Amino acid sequence: MYAVLQSGGKQHRVSEGQTVRLEKLDIATGETVEFDQVMMIANGDDIQIGGPFVTGGKITAEVVAHGRGDKVMIVKFRRRKYFRKHQGHRQWFTDVKITGIGA
């Protein structure tokens, strides 16, 4: 059984017991979160596709950890002018473990 959920403007294919890295959620570690923006649920041959979301579809998950991703360096420069700009960015994320998929 698997499902496709939307979180943080991205779509993720998940199944029970899987740990997924999502955009940062303001929920404490160890808490339970429910996702109701479920776009598809597949259980063998029984497939439910929403338009855009499945009515009554719900995914429950437990927040495992919060953190920041690897650093990405942004560099801007103009040739022959000795103009150089450096900027770094680290995106926040939340790891969640899928505990249940329901329709």
From Swiss-Prot:
Annotated S-S bridges: none
Entry keywords, A to Z: Ribonucleoprotein, Ribosomal protein, RNA-binding, rRNA-binding
Name by which UniProt lists this protein: Large ribosomal subunit protein bL21
Subunit structure comment from the entry: Part of the 50S ribosomal subunit. Contacts protein L20.
Entry-linked Pfam families: Ribosomal_L21p
Annotated InterPro entries: bL21-like (IPR028909), bL21-like_sf (IPR036164), Ribosomal_bL21 (IPR001787), Ribosomal_bL21_CS (IPR018258)
CC annotations in GO: cytoplasm; ribonucleoprotein complex; ribosome
Biological process, per Gene Ontology: translation
GO molecular function, one term: structural constituent of ribosome
Record carries keyword rRNA-binding: yes
Family statement drawn from the similarity comment of this UniProt entry: Belongs to the bacterial ribosomal protein bL21 family.
Described purpose of this protein according to its UniProt entry: This protein binds to 23S rRNA in the presence of protein L20.
